[in-house]
Curated annotation (Swiss-Prot):
GO terms for cellular component: cytosol. It catalyses: DNA(n) + a 2'-deoxyribonucleoside 5'-triphosphate = DNA(n+1) + diphosphate. Mg(2+) binds at D11, D105. The active site is at E106. The gene is dinB. Keywords: Cytoplasm, DNA damage, DNA repair, DNA replication, DNA-binding, DNA-directed DNA polymerase, Magnesium, Metal-binding, Mutator protein, Nucleotidyltransferase, Transferase. This is DNA polymerase IV. GO terms for molecular function: damaged DNA binding; DNA-directed DNA polymerase activity; magnesium ion binding. Its EC number is 2.7.7.7. Poorly processive, error-prone DNA polymerase involved in untargeted mutagenesis. Copies undamaged DNA at stalled replication forks, which arise in vivo from mismatched or misaligned primer ends. These misaligned primers can be extended by PolIV. Exhibits no 3'-5' exonuclease (proofreading) activity. May be involved in translesional synthesis, in conjunction with the beta clamp from PolIII. Its main location: cytoplasm. It is found in: Cytoplasm.
Length: 465
């Protein structure tokens, strides 16, 4: 266990159900259940409104329907959940390079590895406030609970304390160093990592219901009942001793910074200033990682959603802000801005662990005397990601999936059967839409991809599929 509260745990609130409520205005404030649609289906997530009726994850769909017959049961849209998850994880990686995702909606962050004053509790509180605000903005309305503590165990306990149903209006909780043992003492033994239903039942038979009970028990008794490894671990955790490190799931192969603009940009000087600023931020992260880059990339998304990118590969490796900025601006000079730019990004890749001398030189005015290798890629964005979906079984319309009707517009499936698809024509950011039933074989009815989020994570934060 550390002497500072330097581990953060983020947990998205009712994640799948919250994504559905965000994207379907008519479901805001209503009981929403994701999963459990089929006769033998199981609930994946229930909104807080549905939980008031006793519905919870892993419950049989049939039981959930008995408890909340008027809830909206949706089949789930993994594409939307994955996109929002990538945005959340990318936001966490801005705090620290050490992020350990546990699932799509949950992760640990080692704040000591980032640029955070972990000695200052007020500063840590502010980090959590700003993190929640950024997540809400970038996911366009999703909420999360944040816990901070001196270990993974404490951070997880803190995030549970911060949950909306616990009464924390700011959804932030911090367990100060030195208070850990007292904080966890009254909690159920089930709060200890690794204690599931079977272990909890065995502890119950020993009369050990709370963490304080476990702490007071003889270690030999626990080892005899649970085995040496489990018993010893349980004793240590009950005493708030937890040295498990935050382990990043992967090493980033590139570092980039990009912004999407509210209005398309056409002025070259404005774009140049943005590119130079991005290059400086990228270099700051590059230096923090202790690496040097050989490839610099400039990315742009045009007003028509065409994605343009250009890369320069050096014969040496550098972490110089001036050098990387110079190359990025040089590539910007070849970009036609007349149609407008909606996104600009600067990235570096092809890492080395030491600086390497370049085999070409630059004159006093910054002109390259020997050209590095340049590659260029222009990719038209197809309508698939936000328009009609190409691969979909049109004979099957699961509740909740996205659709587009040539006459009525974008919406989602409320229900289907007997050759009829009942649709609600609304989408994220729209007014509550009207409900209309159309024939299943209506040629104007098309499956659709979900609307994309405006903020997209830098390329290194998008794992390859």
């Amino acid at each position: 266990m550390r002497s500072t509260a330097s581990i953060l745990h983020l947990d998205m609130d009712a994640f799948f159900a919250s994504v559905e409520q965000r994207d379907k205005p008519s479901l805001v404030g209503k009981a929403v259940i994701v999963g459990g649609v089929g006769g033998r289906g199981v609930v994946a997530t229930a909104s807080y409104e549905a939980r008031k009726f006793g519905v919870h994850s892993a419950m049989a769909g049939s039981q959930a329907r008995r408890l909340a017959p008027n809830a909206a049961f949706l089949s789930g849209r993994f594409e939307s959940y994955r996109e929002s998850s990538k945005v959340v994880m990318a936001t966490l990686r801005e705090l620290s390079p050490l992020v350990e995702p546990l699932s799509l909606d949950e992760a640990f962050v080692d704040l000591e590895a980032g640029d955070v004053d972990v000695e200052n509790l007020d500063a840590l509180q502010q980090v959590a406030v700003e993190l929640r605000a950024r997540v809400a903005e970038r996911t366009e309305g999703l909420s999360c609970s944040v816990g901070i503590g001196s270990s993974k165990f404490m951070a997880k306990v803190a995030s549970e304390m911060a949950k909306p149903q616990r009464g924390h209006t700011d959804q932030i909780a911090l367990i100060a160093p030195g208070t850990e043992a007292d904080t966890i003492a009254p909690l159920s033994a089930r709060a200890i990592p690794g204690v599931g239903p079977v272990t909890a039942e065995r502890l119950e038979k020993l009369g050990l219901r709370t963490i304080a009970d476990v702490r007071a028990a003889r270690e030999s008794e626990l080892v005899h009942e649970l085995g040496h490894a489990s018993g010893a671990s349980l004793v240590a955790l009950s005493r708030a001793r937890d040295d498990r490190p935050v382990v990043a799931s992967r090493i980033a192969k590139s570092i980039s910074v990009e912004d999407t603009f509210e209005h398309d940009l056409t002025h070259r000087e404005e774009c140049r200033q943005i590119v130079e600023r991005h290059a400086g931020l990228v270099c700051g992260r590059l230096k923090k990682s202790g690496q040097f880059a050989r490839t610099v990339t400039l990315k742009a998304k045009m007003a028509d959603f065409t994605v343009w990118s250009r890369s320069v590969t050096l014969t040496g490796a550098t972490d110089s802000p001036e050098r990387i900025s110079q190359l990025a601006v040089r590539m910007l000079d070849s970009l036609d801005l007349r149609e407008g730019v909606r996104l600009l990004g600067v990235g570096v890749s092809n890492f080395a662990t030491s600086a390497q001398e370049e085999l070409f030189v630059v004159d006093d005015e910054g002109r390259l005397l020997d050209e590095p290798e340049v590659t260029e890629e222009i990719t038209p964005i197809q309508p698939g990601p936000f328009g009609r979906r190409r691969s979909f079984d049109g004979r099957n319309w699961p509740p909740g999936v996205d659709l587009i009707h040539d006459e009525y517009g974008r919406g989602w499936v409320w229900g289907s059967g007997h050759g009829i698809v009942t649709c609600r024509f609304e989408y994220r950011g729209s007014e509550i839409g009207r409900v209309k039933s159309v024939p299943q074989d209506d040629e104007a009815l098309h499956p659709a991809h979900p609307l994309p989020l405006a903020w997209q994570p830098p390329q290194e934060d998008v794992p390859s599929e």
